[in-house]
Amino acid sequence: MRTNFCGTLNVSHVGKTIKLCGWVNKFRNLKEILFIDIRDQTGIIQVLFSKKSELLFKKAADLRNEFCIQVLGIVQERITKNKNYTMSTGEIEIFALELKIFNKSQPLPIDLKSCNIEETRLKFRYLDLRHPNMIRNIIIRNDITIIIRNFMKKNKFLDIETPILTKSTPEGARDYIVPSRIHKNKYYALPQSPQLFKQLLMISGIDRYYQIAKCFRDEDLRSDRQPEFTQIDIEVSFLNAKKVRKIIERMITSVWNKIINVHLKKFQKLSFYDAIKMYGTDKPDLRNPIQLIDVTNIIHVKNNINAITLPNKKTQQNIVIAMCIPRGMSLNINYINSYHHLVQKYTKNKLFNVEVLNHCPIKEQKKTSFHKKPSSDLTFQLISKTSAKHGDMIFYLSEKSPLVYEIMGKLRIELGKDLNLIDYNSWKPLWITNFPLFKKNELNQYISTHHPFTAPKYMKIDTSITNYEEIVADSYDLVINGYEIGSGSVRIHDLELQKTVFNILGINTVLQKNNFNFFLNALKYGTPPHAGIALGLDRITMLLTNSHNLRDVIAFPKTTTGSCLTTGAPSKIIHF
């Protein structure tokens, strides 16, 4: 039906007869000549119809936007004044010889040349995908998967599919359940990840596995979550955590280089606890230069009293965390009030700020917002501790840990945005390591920080300790610009250690047998040391396309309620 794609033509094709297929993007009837822009997934090119060909011109005059057509014509160079160098095809046009209309189009319910409300976009997704930005996102997503597959093949990884209909095994989120027609009162679960299957592949002797896998989690949604999502799933035998990270660094560096021509610099590494103490989150955006500073040993804010006092053993239940904000004095009162309101959402304790004035020595600079003036000595120490300079502002808060870190971490993000401290053209990859193996939920029960198959450091658990939250996991998350794009760990390959972890998690022997017996049995047969990671393809694509929502990089996404507006799913089943 066609000889070429619209966006691939250039001046080297001048004089050639070609055939194109696509959609009318724009038309202009100038009485003696008629121009249309024809569009396909590769781009747009201008087509010229001359009135000298009366029948052809008359047929072209009936064209409207989004008609699906075929054009036969000759490539010709535009006259100089009509060349459009902002288009890849702007130096040429097609002189039409034949026109075929495959299908007419009604006026579209969305505008492909401007923004549309998201509900309309998702309802008419098949039309929304015609937008150049959406086509670009889909093409980039495709290119990313090709780069990853080529990298994996080069590094001797095997692409192996694992089951979609599987057994329900608790992994953190709720499962999507599929009833079995043949096995009455029994159910399949859609996989939250291929975790156990890829570990079984390691036991089977497959050294290096990967899969671009569809996963399903029935959890609360937000802009960077979907109920079904795609992950780059990877597992290797006989490699430690450091070597796994090196492989992933090479792969991610290759993707960034080939997609956006950016060479990522050294991947930094922080422990989980250092990340919390320095940035208030385990997913810090390192483009933001603001860091949290513990100043408890300098000052302490008494509860409900707006004054600074010397540290006191009786008041050390709270800690004091400060931040020095570069050029913070440029913030107007509305911004500062908004920060106080932000803090008040999480605590009744007051947020304080200190302004640093004048180009005099640091020990002489001070201007504060305290109702009771602090001792100058403490203020000098605070300014010195935070390395504050002229024009900076210091914020600090007294609260219990870890809440104080969480609050100041949120404030840090807002300040970075409001003061334009973030270089949005830079990339800061970061590994977060040494997570706690366990944490407690709202019922004060131990749960896995990642999943129950994560190994502790050194493959040991001292069961005599009373606080299992102190046990460090051999795990690692990859964070880029504040987004977690991957999470992995060394896995447990010892049967008794796996049982110990299950017991700590409250998974008794009966539950172990019902849910994990197949896996525990497999661990008996020469299980190799192994490790792996899962990277979010959707999030990676979101970052590389500079999108702000996962829905912009998935062809047919769900809403925040898990609905597909295009098809109306979920829906009642009507039997024929």
Curated annotation (Swiss-Prot):
The annotated region (Aspartate) lies at 195-198
Any idea which UniProt keywords this protein has?
A: Aminoacyl-tRNA synthetase, ATP-binding, Cytoplasm, Ligase, Nucleotide-binding, Protein biosynthesis
Instruction: Write down the top EC class of this protein.
Output: ligase
Is Transferase one of the keywords? Answer: no
Q: Which Gene3D superfamilies match?
A: Bira Bifunctional Protein, Domain 2, GAD-like domain, Nucleic acid-binding proteins
Question: Do the record's keywords include ATP-binding?
Answer: yes
Any signal peptide, and if so, which residues? none
Q: Where does this protein reside within or beyond the cell? A: Cytoplasm
> What cellular component terms from Gene Ontology apply here?
cytoplasm
**Subunit structure, as described in the record:** Homodimer.
Q: Which family does it belong to?
A: Belongs to the class-II aminoacyl-tRNA synthetase family. Type 1 subfamily.
What function is annotated for this protein? Catalyzes the attachment of L-aspartate to tRNA(Asp) in a two-step reaction: L-aspartate is first activated by ATP to form Asp-AMP and then transferred to the acceptor end of tRNA(Asp).
Task: State the name under which the record lists this protein.
Answer: Aspartate--tRNA ligase
Q: What is the lineage of its organism?
A: Bacteria, Pseudomonadati, Pseudomonadota, Gammaproteobacteria, Enterobacterales
What's the name of its gene? aspS
